[in-house]
Each structure stands twice: as structure tokens, then as C-alpha cells.
Amino acid sequence: MLRGGCKASEKRRHLSESLSWQQDQALSSSIYLLRQIGPTGFLLKEEEPEKGDFRVLLGNPHECSCPTFLKRGELCKHICWVLLKKFKLPRNHESAFQLGLTEGEINDLLRGIHQVQAPQLRASDETAQVEEDGYLKQKDINAGDICPICQEVLLEKKLPVTFCRFGCGNNVHIKCMRILANYQDTGSDSSVLRCPLCREEFAPLKVILEEFKNSNKLITISEKERLDKHLGIPCNNCNQLPIEGRCYKCTECVEYHLCQECFDSCCHSSHAFASREKRNQRWRSVEKRSEVMKYLNTENEGEAKPGCFQEKQGQFYTPKHVVKSLPLLMITKKSKLLAPGYQCRLCLKSFSFGQYTRLLPCTHKFHRKCIDNWLLHKCNSCPIDRQVIYNPLIWKGIATDGQAHQLASSKDIACLSKQQEPKLFIPGTGLVLKGKRMGVLPSIPQYNSKVLTTLQNPSDNYQNITMDDLCSVKLDNSNSRKLVFGYKISKQFPTYLKNPTTGQTPSQTFLPSLPHKNIICLTGRESPHIYEKDHIGQSQKTSRGYEHINYNTRKSLGSRLRQHKRSSALSSEDLNLTINLGTTKLSLSKRQNNSMGKVRQKLGHPPRRPAYPPLQTQNAALSLIMQGIQL
């Protein structure tokens, strides 16, 4: 008899697009069966707590308490979940897209004659073995075993499981039992949960809570990454790591992948490709390609037919030496992996004392035998988050300590190579000192010039100075350039270039000429630094005119000026200024405490001549040699 006196709905012959979308939502959503009300009534709960619980009744027509069904009257994802997940109907089965089913069709559905997978998990009639702790022995998990709450295959979902300790010994997801515990509304931790299969006592609530807490520690950050990130797979063209969005894999080359942008630019166009959008999807052959790609394939491949890509043919397994290089850990008596809830997520069995575990780059831990068999014979990626273990583009190889290492992408290496070296810029000249050590000032070699007071070390290092961006100033031997420099020097140093006897400025000033290439500079003893503080004009004199002031370390020039401040002229022994026709030479010595020397200017009272104090270092000498002008 039909429920509520409703008429039998019209039979549908084809699956509509809207219903197909609802089926996709049902298969991709996390829906849990909290309670079964009779043979055709089901209380469901979604993972999002704000959506609440929904009641589904199968009949003619089907009913659901969700807003989507109440508004449209069409099959919602909750009804589709019961038909596809609970009763294992194929998506294209006639009973899967009808608005209602007759009594005969419902009886066939309950008997499972349409199921394409193994029948649902039931309590075994065999006598369960009792362990020493009083609990039943956990049953082994087979390939077709499913969780009675989420209806997912246990070995495919790879989530930690618990088992019924007092009734049947069957396995259930720990997460699902935690959700069921919230629905049963147990009063205290000492209460016992009911088994969703045998309806007997399942396990104490405190045991489930401890297992749930520990099992959450097995979840890594990589599992929470978006599925459109292909972890561990770099683009062989642009070195993007990981590839995001659609990923393309060459069907002929070993581990050759391209991102969407590089694939569209016709990179590696001579071979056929397979693609996937998410890392948990299968690779599918790329059939529809642009006209440019078709033309290139026709020209390069000749009579080769792309065909459908078979994943087994293009499967690449992890090399044996890479598997052996992964860290190997032995479980000790005090290991945390012995706590309830910790287990290998491949075989879903607990860890035991003395066993060996392998640690993957994504920090997942497995039994050594389980993960070795997986990597060597099944797949080259982690079975949980699908992160690729070995890729020739980023793998460095086996380290001497047995640890596995990975290289950074070539893009990162290129960025490191492009880092600028430290530079010391001398204002106004365009000379740039490039070197690995900071604070080393150059000493320009002297040609045909006289040396007065210099402190040099024969073991001083040599460095190269490059000419960089001289702008309008060009150092050569032309007379025009000498005149230009002479004019600029006369403007900057009108006092020092005057003839003391005549009081006139010479018509020409001869400046040193510097070669443009391979200028060898003698540095200080190690790394002297100079701060020309509070005296900008003095730095301009040194840079533009290549002039250096010689301060006598035995008796400073300032003391001599103070002694003869009433005299009208200075002795030539006290100050010897010379313009050198060769190249000016700058030599500095290092302070004992590696501090920076300072050149300070002390101005006298007008109209007296300004006094120039000695350099504030113990054994440093700064020389300015000018030749051709009599003071």
C-alpha cells in the first residue's frame, strides 16, 4: 500500500543534469547515518553542525526534511546518499533517479540484488576471541569492509578505526563513533556506547574520546591543503612548485609535468599528455587540444595515435634507493605510537613494540612493510595526501647519513644567484667597489709619482674596481677633459690651488688619468672604514680631485698651526701639497678595535686660516700629494 494514498509517480527513463549534480554532491559530502528507523527510515547528519539532522523516508514518493526537497520536490542529495551509499545502487540504475519506488522495488532494494559491491558489514556468527584485557579481539579488515555510519570503504578512506569490544568485534571509524556519541547524548565518560551493527555495548566513552584525541594527531598539514594543489609535482618548464590548478603529465617521459600556462604555450608538444584537476583524481587522456597543438602533433608524431591514456602503463614507481633513504624509526616501550588511536593508515592496525616505521616527507608514519610495498609496487606518492615522493627535478639523492633530501626549485636557485653583491660607492666619480667584504677602500696604483708617508703591508689583498656610469665625466687624456676638471677643481678648491707668492690661480690643472679596465687597488690591512662626518666638502675634494691630505703622525699639523698661528705663511716642511701627474694613491690602515676612523673639520676664527686636525686613529695616515704648485 502506498504511503499517504499518493499515486505512483511516472517512471523516468533518463538521468537529468540537475539530478546528476545532486548525486555528485551526495558522493562528495560527509554524511553520517545516526540511526535507522525501520527498514526504510534513516536519520542523517552532515559534517557541518549548522545544517542539523535530516530524516529520509523511502517510498512512493520519497521524502526528506531538508529545505531543498521541501522547496522543489525533487530528489535531494540526502535521498541520493541513501540510494547510492547505503544500498549501493549504481548512478545510472533506473531505481536511482525515480521520485518513488513501489513495494516490490523496495523489497528488491532491501535484499541487495542491485548491489555491485560487497554486501554491507554484518555481525559475524563466528565466536569472537576474547583478549587478556577482557575485550573481544579486533577483526581483520578486508577489502570490502565498510563503516556502518559513513558507508565508506575502510581501506579506501584510510581513516583511523576502532572496534566493538563487547559485541561483534567489527571496525568503525573513530571519527564516526565520536559523532554517534554526540547523538546518543551520553551523560558521563563512564557511559558505554552502543554498536551500530550488533546493538550491543561497543566501548566505554572515555576510550573513544582518548582514541579520537590521539587519532587527530595523525592528520598532517598537507592533508588540509586544497586538492587543486599537486603536492610534490613541479612544472618542468617554469619550475612552479607545486603546480596549482590543472596539471598535465607526459605519457611518454618519466615524471614530466606542465602547468596550465606552460601547456598552453605548446611546451613539449611532440608527446601526448594526460591531465587531472585535483590530486585525488585519475589521470585522463587529453583529447581536445588547440589547432596549434594538433598541427604540431601531426607534424612531429606522424602516424602515432594518442588513444586513451592508461594509468598503469604510465605509472612510475618509487626507486628502491629512494625508499631506503627514507627515515626508519623503531618503536620503543615509551613511544607515543603505542597509545590508543595511533595506527598505520594503510593497514589500519595499531603499532606494536619493536616494529619499524617509515617517515615520509609529509610527516606521515606507516609500517615499514606497508609503505615499502606501496611505494615500490603501487604508487610514487603518499597514500594519504597524494604528495609525490620522488621527482627527478627536485630530488637530490641519498645523503651519507641515510636521510632523504630534496633540492629547492631552480627558480629559488636562480633567485639566490641574482642577489647583488655589496657595493661601496664613492660619490661623484662613478667608481664602484664590488667585493664580498664590506668596508674595504681601494688604493689606486701610482704611476710616475712620489710617495711621501704611507703605511702599507706587503701582504695586503688586491681587488678590482670597475668603472660604472661616469655620466658626463669621462676620464681620459684629452686636453678638453683636463680643462673641464681643472675648472671644476678651481671652483671646489679655490684656496688650495692659489699660488701663495703671486696669489693667482694657474690656468691649467693637471689631473691624473685612470685606466677604464682592470684597475688594481691595494686595500687596507683588513677592512678599514671611514666616515666623513660633519665634513661633506672634504669628501667631495677627495672624490672629485683625487687629492689626499698628509697628516704627520709624529707631530700633527694642527699642533704646528697652533704654534705658528701668528705667522703669515706656512713652512713647506709642515704642508706639502702636490698635484701628481700620475695616479693618486690612497692608503689607509686599520684601527686596532676595528672601529671606523673619522675625519673631522675644526674651523678657526676668521680671518685666520682653518686648522686641520690629525686623523683620529693611532697609526693611520691620509696623504694628499700635490705637485707643481709652490705654497
From Swiss-Prot:
Any one of the GO BP annotations: positive regulation of extrinsic apoptotic signaling pathway via death domain receptors
UniProt xrefs under InterPro entries = Znf_RING, Znf_RING/FYVE/PHD, Znf_SWIM, Znf_ZZ, Znf_ZZ_sf, Zswim2
Please list the GO terms describing molecular function: ubiquitin protein ligase activity; ubiquitin-protein transferase activity; zinc ion binding
**Highest taxon of the lineage:** Eukaryota
Observed phenotype of the null mutant: Male mutants fecundity is normal.
Binding annotation for Zn(2+) 1: C235, C238, C259, C262
Q: Where are the zinc fingers (ZZ-type)?
A: 230-281
Report the catalytic activity: S-ubiquitinyl-[E2 ubiquitin-conjugating enzyme]-L-cysteine + [acceptor protein]-L-lysine = [E2 ubiquitin-conjugating enzyme]-L-cysteine + N(6)-ubiquitinyl-[acceptor protein]-L-lysine
PTM note says:
Polyubiquitinated. Polyubiquitination is followed by degradation via the proteasome.
Read off the SUPFAM superfamilies from this record: RING/U-box
**Ranges annotated as SWIM-type zinc finger:** 54-87
Which tissues is this protein detected in according to the database?
Answer: Expressed only in testis.
Residue spans annotated as Zn fingers (RING-type) read 147-199, 344-386
Which keywords does this chain's UniProt record carry? Apoptosis, Metal-binding, Repeat, Transferase, Ubl conjugation, Ubl conjugation pathway, Zinc, Zinc-finger
Q: Where is the composition biased (Basic residues)?
A: 599-608
Protein's job? E3 ubiquitin-protein ligase involved in the regulation of Fas-, DR3- and DR4-mediated apoptosis. Functions in conjunction with the UBE2D1, UBE2D3 and UBE2E1 E2 ubiquitin-conjugating enzymes.
Assembly, in brief, is:
Dimer. Interacts with UBE2D1.
* Record text about domains: The SWIM-type zinc finger is required for ubiquitination activity.
Which PANTHER family does this entry report, sorted A to Z? E3 UBIQUITIN-PROTEIN LIGASE ZSWIM2, RING FINGER AND SWIM DOMAIN-CONTAINING PROTEIN 2
The name on file for this protein is E3 ubiquitin-protein ligase Zswim2
Organism annotation: Mus musculus
